[in-house]
């Protein structure tokens, strides 16, 4: 990098899947004080171009092809001048650079729910401290074998995998992209002891037909998931020490996290204390607001978006719903913007999703609000079923009706094979904005 003229403070983009090359470039950029700009491998040419221009990237390191995507052709299309195919990289001479804790380490582009994503600016201090605090909470040991499901181009991969494993000296295991069958095979073969991920990733693992024949060595990790999924993770994957976690890119990412020594029921319910030095408050609208050392410096070259992200007194607006108990433990209850109103009654999708997930046949559940002439909005649910189980739309709606007030019962429900084509991101999250758009078309609304 230094031979290419890259120096302290220069943004450098990385476009490639998980692997040793990504890690080498990330660590190298950090050593010379450069700022890594991870590029989502699912981005199209115009999205890559936007990120490069918005961040002011001085160079782009890429692999020529991945998943039948011709990145070389994309880069030629956008005409970026300093693009380096990693297969052509040669070893250079390293000149030490003095890097400060407050220097930028990463510009993380978020999953865009509007026209384009925003570049979250994170420092060495915020990411390393977050990785250390999270690793301490889940009890990482030097002898652990930690399987990372998350893409390195997200903070769940960079902070909570690449940096966490470096700090604690454990073995990091990963795959170029997540696929349940390959992940289960890797977990068994590498005797992994820790794993992390969101609800969708764990549901895909637990719902796969290969799970019963795999001999897993898992003891813990962390999961961003609701109570039904947390209980299943403990019972079906044997992760007795699994911890609940909540965070967002703008917070480096984790805000609260269980301790592996917390009582099991607290961890299942997702009741977790903030990381040391992080403060949380709940607004009148029940929004989670945060401040402390892990919060972003702002959005890259976007002062208007940065100003809107904070309250007048300096708290980060998360856009998430939550509540604090008397012990100061947070329970996240869904996205504020995902709440919909049925005849004047507020419905949080997470409430209905938890009921659907309690059905023995349901693997994954996602609920969105869709227009209704009489009630304003009604619920629309998409579910996947566990391997070997059967259920009809009518049975699942009846299941919810028996357990929820009528206004919470979905008026539409569709059983699907997966969410890959209707809203799932590369990090395994389901974007409800895209899922809602799909529902409007599918049901002619």
Which residue stretches match the model-derived regions?
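Short hydrophobic alpha-helices that are characteristic scaffold elements of the AMP-binding
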Residues: 27-32, 53-54, 154, 163-167
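Conserved AMP-binding/adenylate-forming
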Residues: 1-46, 346
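Gly/Ser/Thr-rich phosphate-binding loop
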Residues: 184, 189-197, 206-265, 279
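AMP-binding/adenylate-forming catalytic core of the ANL superfamily
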Residues: 43-50, 60-62, 195, 282-287, ...
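Conserved pre-ATP/AMP-binding loop-to-beta segment of ANL
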Residues: 84, 92-109, 116, 121, ...
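Conserved AMP-binding/adenylation subdomain of ANL enzymes
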Residues: 128-145, 152-194, 204, 208
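Structural core segment of the AMP-binding/adenylate-forming
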Residues: 3-4, 31-88, 387-389, 402
């Amino acid at each position: 990098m230094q031979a290419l003229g890259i120096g302290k403070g220069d943004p450098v983009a990385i476009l490639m899947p998980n692997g040793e090359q990504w890690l080498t470039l990330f660590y190298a950029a950090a050593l010379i004080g450069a700022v890594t700009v991870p590029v989502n491998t699912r981005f199209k040419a115009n999205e890559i171009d936007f990120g490069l221009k918005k961040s002011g990237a001085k160079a782009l390191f890429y692999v020529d092809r991945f998943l039948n995507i011709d990145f070389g052709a994309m880069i030629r299309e956008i005409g970026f001048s300093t693009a380096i195919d990693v297969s052509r990289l040669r070893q250079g001479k390293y000149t030490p650079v003095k890097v400060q804790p407050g220097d930028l380490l990463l510009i993380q582009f978020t999953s865009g729910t509007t026209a384009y994503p925003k570049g979250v600016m994170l420092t060495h201090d915020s990411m390393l401290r977050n990785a250390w605090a999270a690793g301490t909470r889940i009890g990482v040991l030097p002898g652990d074998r930690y399987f990372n499901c998350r893409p390195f181009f997200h903070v769940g991969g960079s902070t909570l995998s690449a940096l966490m494993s470096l700090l604690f000296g454990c073995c990091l295991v990963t795959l170029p992209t997540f696929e349940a069958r390959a992940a289960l095979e890797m977990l068994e073969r590498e005797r992994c002891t820790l794993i992390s991920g969101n609800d969708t990733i764990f549901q895909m693992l637990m719902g796969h037909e290969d799970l019963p024949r795999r001999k897993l060595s898992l003891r813990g990790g962390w999961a961003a998931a609701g109570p039904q999924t947390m209980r299943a993770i403990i019972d079906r994957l044997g992760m007795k020490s699994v911890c609940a976690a909540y965070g967002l890119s703008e917070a480096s990412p984790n805000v609260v996290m269980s301790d592996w020594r917390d009582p099991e029921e607290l961890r299942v319910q997702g009741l977790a204390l903030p990381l040391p030095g992080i403060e949380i408050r709940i607004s009148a609208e029940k929004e989670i607001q945060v401040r402390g050392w892990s919060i972003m410096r702002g959005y890259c070259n976007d002062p208007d978006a940065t100003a809107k992200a904070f309250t007048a007194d300096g708290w980060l607006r998360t856009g998430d719903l939550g509540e604090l108990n008397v012990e100061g433990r947070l329970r996240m209850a869904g996205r504020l913007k995902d709440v919909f109103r049925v005849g004047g009654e507020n419905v949080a999708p997470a409430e209905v999703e938890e009921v659907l997930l309690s059905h023995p046949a349901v693997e994954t559940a996602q609920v969105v609000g869709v227009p209704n002439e009489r009630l304003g909005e009604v619920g629309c649910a998409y579910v996947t079923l566990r391997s070997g189980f059967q259920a009809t739309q009518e049975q699942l709606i009846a299941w919810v009706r028996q357990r929820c007030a009528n206004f919470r019962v979905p008026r539409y429900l569709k059983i699907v094979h997966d969410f890959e084509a209707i809203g799932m991101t590369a990090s395994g999250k389901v974007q409800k904005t895209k899922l809602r758009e799909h529902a409007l078309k599918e049901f002619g609304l």
